[in-house]
Amino acid sequence: MKSIDLHVHSTYSDGTLTPSELVKKAFSINLAAMALTDHDTIDGIPEAVSCAADYDIELIPGIELSTFYDKKEMHIVGLYIDYTDKNFKKELESLKQSREKRNEKIAARFCEMGIPVSYDEMKKMYEGAVITRANFADYLVRKGYVKSRNEVFDRYLGDSKPCYVPREKMLPEKAIKMIKSVGGVPVLAHPVLYHMGNEQMNKLMDYLCEHGIAGLEAVYSTYTMGDELEMKHIAKERNLLISGGSDYHGANKPDIELGTGRGHLFVPEEILTKIKEYKNNI
């Protein structure tokens, strides 16, 4: 059975490969399907779809929406979205403008600390991309202001650090509604990464199920076998779909490979069959 990867980022957010390069790489490693799930943007999907038409691989239009729940940043992945929907594009444009304002504030804070970050220069450097904290980290390393991306987050951009600026908060329920409004399948991204105890996780899943979540990422690059079994148990208990992916970012996450994560990731094609069945019955 072939494998798939349902969580991948391109240069249109904080990945380092273009959509076309991702499709070609996915084909070269024999993936049956790949979902392009850039942060809060669908701008890379047309290029990916066009490229995939020349290769024997299914390209799934997707997105990863950033939300907040109980003071935690939380991501909702949308699979099989209608990326041509005009209202959806308008909502994403609003999110983009909010992120722009935040990025300008982050750049200003660096300048106040004596680190000359030019946001105009960054926009040229990452032209067409949704600029995230990962881009700030890459920029600072390139300019020689810090030695590593980890240093940026440890000293400046991690939550509560001096240059961190909180984003405008969107609730997961809104992200789920947005995804379902364009025929997509909403999935909770990497739940283990939110470091919740059983009580917190149950409360979260109650809330998400109430608002129409369809599945969760039970297979993920950094999960242990125990993590994967636990997530699959939660999915089965709540009659949710299982999704999975590498969360590949290219050089921005050098220890994560497309399709295989840290070497042990395998997302079976049968997972996609069940997601398609759900999609067809919406």
Language model features with spans:
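Extended substrate/RNA-proximal surfaces in nucleic-acid metabolism proteins
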Residues: 51-206, 262-282
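An N-terminally biased module of ancient metal coordination in phosphate/nucleic-acid-related enzymes
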Residues: 1-72, 156-158, 170-226, 230-253
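H/E-rich (His + Asp/Glu) clusters that bind or coordinate divalent metals
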Residues: 253-265
